Regions:
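Active-site neighborhoods and metal-handling regions in enzymes and metal-associated proteins
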Residues: 1-462
Length: 462
């Protein structure tokens, strides 16, 4: 693989070697070029809507990479690329930029990458430089990053598509982009357009996400299999991390939640350092990254391998709700609609479980559902865990969109308004879903044990 794209190595079942036409494993130069052309087409449509002056203007698109961030002197955090830049280029190197330019339709690509520097490469590893970047991406016009400002000045765009309110690379923004903006061009936000493109996954992207789901499912099975009473959350965390990497993941997609007992009712608990007692359940919300695409799966199970009657009751209630929500995952339905359905189904389960009285009105049952499940039913998924935040969850789902479906019920141990047997129990069940043309969605996490019988069977496989 080119030095430009060393992040995470090149492991896993999906690809053993990157072919000559691939920029990142599974994604070719043609795919990245098509993404840039689609973005140019979206801007062309936007320009036409703004009137004849805008459609005849010189348009510039500016997308910056992330810089390296440091946790302390000389100690960097693991590098995480700006996903919009990565989506359009495939480049995993910091201190880089992409510019698209053209009259009416900005379809001419110019890349900027750091200059080769043997002194820095001794410490940080090889850079590709201009020639390597051109060979990797197929983009013919490549400059050193230090030339970005001069090139922008020479292009003289009258409409600039750029997100500068919170620049992802403050240094490049201040040195190279800000002088251009001070010249008074019309500036329009690019992020809504890139997110609308990223939301619709190509077959190649779905294949990468499917592999991320397969890897994560294997990690869940292995982690369930080593569970036992009085086990440290840190050990489960380490096992899950190890198994993801051992099965081909580059790394975890986010700090996982490994929450035993009542800690499962803290939605973003990530301390993962307490003992899960014999007879308690553990909630593990985790996922991996596989060549720039992620999984996000949650399972809840008893660490001693057997659900108690109360645990089984609550678990089955959440599972029934999740099945109902999954059945709605089809084109034309929105995440907000599925969320409304989730609340109604949870309200019904709360009545059946006796957590609220059977005589509770529908309106009060919905209030109780919001109390015991204070989060949405899901979110978009892709290169990021909470992907494409510019997209509203009220938008109708389309084939190729990837989402999560993750209902839960969380009963705090000090809640004296519910039957005692449920206090201190928290259950969430989360799957990753791709919307398809057919009625049935593609469940990327389908190999992860989910029924009580399958979970208990996985726990018994020590």
């Amino acid at each position: 693989m080119s030095p430009l794209n060393q992040e995470g190595g090149n492991r896993g079942r999906f690809h053993q070697d990157t072919s000559a036409s691939e920029v990142t494993p599974g994604l070719t130069q043609t795919e990245f070029d098509l993404r840039r052309q689609r973005l140019a087409s979206l801007i062309e449509v936007q320009a036409d809507r703004l009137g004849p002056t805008a459609s005849s203007n010189k348009h510039l698109v500016i997308v910056l990479s992330h810089p390296i961030c440091y946790m302390t002197n000389d100690i960097p955090y693991p590098f995480h690329q700006n996903q919009d830049f990565l989506y359009l280029t495939g480049i995993l190197e910091p201190d880089s930029a992409l510019v698209l330019c053209g009259t009416g339709r900005p379809d001419q690509a110019i890349l900027f990458v750091p200059r080769r520097d043997p002194a820095r490469e001794l410490w940080d590893g090889p850079r590709s430089g201009k020639d390597g970047a051109a060979a990797l991406t197929g983009v013919e016009r490549v400059h050193c990053t230090e030339e970005l400002g001069l090139v922008l000045k020479s292009l003289k765009g009258s409409t600039v598509w750029y997100d500068g309110s919170k620049p992802c690379h403050p240094g490049l923004h201040q040195t190279h982009v800000r002088p251009l903006l001070e010249g008074g061009p019309m500036v329009r936000s690019l992020r809504p357009l890139t997110h609308s493109l990223r939301a619709l996954k190509s077959p190649a992207e779905v294949a990468l996400m499917k592999e991320a789901g397969r890897i994560t499912a294997q990690a869940f099975k292995k982690t369930m299999g080593m569970s036992q009473g009085d086990i440290d959350e840190a050990l489960l965390y380490a096992k899950f991390d190890f198994e993801c990497r051992a099965h081909g993941a580059n790394f975890l997609a986010y700090p996982p939640v490994v929450a035993g007992g009542n800690r499962a009712n803290t939605l973003h608990y990530i301390n993962n350092n307490q003992i899960v007692k014999n007879g308690e359940m553990v909630l593990l919300d985790g996922g991996c990254e596989y060549f720039c695409y992620v999984s996000d799966i949650t399972r809840t199970w008893p660490v001693n391998g057997k659900f108690s009657p109360a645990q089984a009751e609550l678990y089955e209630g959440v599972l029934e709700v999740q099945k109902g929500c999954l059945s709605l995952c089809s084109p034309g339905v929105s995440l907000d609609h599925i969320y409304s359905t989730m609340l109604a189904l949870l309200g019904r389960q709360l009545r059946q479980l006796g957590i609220v009285k059977s005589s509770t009105s529908d309106a009060d049952a919905l209030k109780a559902a919001r109390r015991y499940c204070p989060h949405h039913v899901g979110h978009y998924l892709g290169m990021d865990v909470h992907d494409t935040p510019e997209l509203s969850r009220s938008q109708p789902l389309q084939p190729g969109m990837a989402i999560t479906i993750e209902p839960g019920l969380y009963i705090c141990e000090d809640d004296d308004q519910v039957p005692e047997r449920f206090r201190g129990l928290g259950v969430r069940i989360e799957d990753d879903v791709v919307i398809q043309d057919e009625i049935n969605p593609l469940i990327l996490s389908s190999d992860t044990p989910k029924t009580i019988a399958d979970v208990e069977r996985a726990c018994a496989q020590s």
